[in-house]
Amino acid sequence: MNNPLVVALAYDGLCTFEFGIAVEIFGLARPEMGDNWYRFAVAGVEPGELRATGGIRLMVDGGLELLAEAGTIIVPGWRGADVPVPAALCEQLIAAHQRGARILSICSGVFVLAAAGLLDKRQATTHWRYTDLLQQRYPAIQVTPDVLYIDSGDVLTSAG
């Protein structure tokens, strides 16, 4: 039995809607999907207590070290398009991608993938309110507005 590990990122200021999508899809038992359904874990981007929007306390399964085991990594909507992405997170995402992990962003999580350089010379999408800003900041990305998602196989982006 091989249950691939899906890891969703959590961080202070996390948007619960996008995070909830990952939890609903991969975090619930799915016996109808067979024995090889995914394992699910939550990785804290930074140590210590994390609070999502609205002050909701988050419990994580570990830190960025979990990304080394993940077959799929989900980056929910980032805490703000103007908030810098930690270098350690970028490094872990690059390493995971290089070893073959799928990397997926939801909504403004695309800015994390862009900061890591994972979208250079690729098509990508995000929420319509961020498409112009994404294109301005990262001209090497082929921003495709007005689509719900772009699936490049190893990197996926969604509108959110």
Question: Which sequence ranges carry the predicted segments?
Answer:
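Conserved anion/nucleotide-ligand pocket segment
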Residues: 148-160
